[in-house]
């Protein structure tokens, strides 16, 4: 699972909503095709990993893949059957804050049909609407 090696603060503030569009990471920089987010959402490390596995299965050894998102925000949670109060819960899982327009994954060295199938399968693993974009 993806997670930071170390963080400055263990329990960050959770922002009430994700505003605006992606300013950085909004263009296909490394590969030929990319999977672009169309809506704002938190994407968990498990979801990123599931999508990465699907794309790598399609790419096999002939293609190359880049993951352009990283879960660097800790989400805290109280244990089950715990009364309210008593401070903030312990870190439970990690999420990446994704804004509309952000490129999530990039691939290179695959034909268009294989890329479309791989990205569609990866998109099914993610909680957001996405679209396939090309460098050209």
UniProtKB/Swiss-Prot annotation:
Record carries keyword Ribosomal protein: yes
Domain of life, per lineage: Bacteria
Key words, A-Z: Ribonucleoprotein, Ribosomal protein, RNA-binding, rRNA-binding, tRNA-binding
Record's GO cellular component terms: cytosolic large ribosomal subunit
SUPFAM superfamilies: Ribosomal protein L16p/L10e
UniProt-listed GO biological process terms: translation
Pfam families, A to Z: Ribosomal_L16
Listed GO MF terms: rRNA binding; structural constituent of ribosome; tRNA binding
Keyword tRNA-binding: yes
PANTHER family attached to this UniProt entry: 50S/60S RIBOSOMAL PROTEIN L16, LARGE RIBOSOMAL SUBUNIT PROTEIN UL16M
Subunit-structure text: Part of the 50S ribosomal subunit.
Record function comment: Binds 23S rRNA and is also seen to make contacts with the A and possibly P site tRNAs.
Stated family: Belongs to the universal ribosomal protein uL16 family.
NCBIfam families in the record: rplP_bact
Protein's name in the database: Large ribosomal subunit protein uL16
Gene (name only): rplP
